[in-house]
Amino acid sequence: MVRGAVARSFAPLLLVLAMLAAGRAPAAEWEGALRGSARLLLDTNAPRDYSDRTTRGPERDFAFSLLGAAEGRGSFERAQLVGRYELGARKYVLYQEEDTLVQSGAMEASHALGTSLGIGLEGHAKDRRGGSRSYSDLGTTAFLEYAPDVRLALRVRAGARRFVYRPAPTANFGGPEVGVLGRYRFDRRHSLSVFGDWNARRFGTAPRARPPGTGGSSGLLPGRRQDGALTAGASYTYRGPVALGLTYAFQELSSNSYGETLRRHRVSANAGVRLPWRVTLLAQGSLGLTQYPDGIYLSPEIILVEEDEGQNSLSAKLARPLTDTLDLEASWGIWSTRLPRNALTYTRQVFSVGFTWRY
């Protein structure tokens, strides 16, 4: 069902891509890239369990991961096609129920209406199978882009999103979404971006009423659960001897179902620097503060799906080229979060070493 839905969601976009590619442009310039990675990992929390002071954490486990990626771009006289696809797999030794297969893809077709205005369509899909977080995330949007010069770029988009969470179908939702992205480059090293997105989420279940003693009666309310997801923020980027990035994002999820509302502030930073012996160091970290006005009724697994790996994280990677197309890489990452009121905590560390091939 989901794979069929993915194909159907991309069918209109594929038609537009073909129409644009078959335009009056006599020829097109094509470019592409391939990338593959193989890594050995040590995972301290493969099942992604929450624990407290009285609960023993899961055992450490080894895993082997493979990742393949392909991307391409076609440039015509007044049109451009961009696409990418990734396929990843992870195999554990002890926690074999956490073995995963992840696919993701995105396509974009744009057409210039003049020297500074353009329109286009884009679509994306991600499908994760296996483990405790099996889901599919689909979306298509149309956008209008304004770029009067190399300094300023503004994109406004509108479309629809569908999310399917297999372990708990009550978390499935769909609905329209709109967004805006603006970027201003002060010079070749400094740039500032602002962004905002809003998604109306309609679920197939009834909303939860406020429990007795909190201003309402227990049980379910008539109608369907409806959420509004708002995200807004800004980011600064510096490109020089050291690459730096700093992002602040605010997210508000308001729901007519009791216990599903949350507000989140998140700050993230990343850096990259060249070290001696042709070694590159990449580092990334994030801190989050989340408020739950009604307390928590959200499933911890769903929280991790939304945030990918929890609220707070720190990771680092060292890479050194062995040849023109092969790199040796070593990485470490830690992710953690804490749920208020019940004192449950989530902590996970992953160590890895492997190779990345590029073409």
Give residue ranges: language-model regions.
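Bacterial N-terminal signal peptides that target proteins for export
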Residues: 1-13
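Bacterial N-terminal signal peptides
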Residues: 11-21
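Gram-negative and organellar
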Residues: 27-359
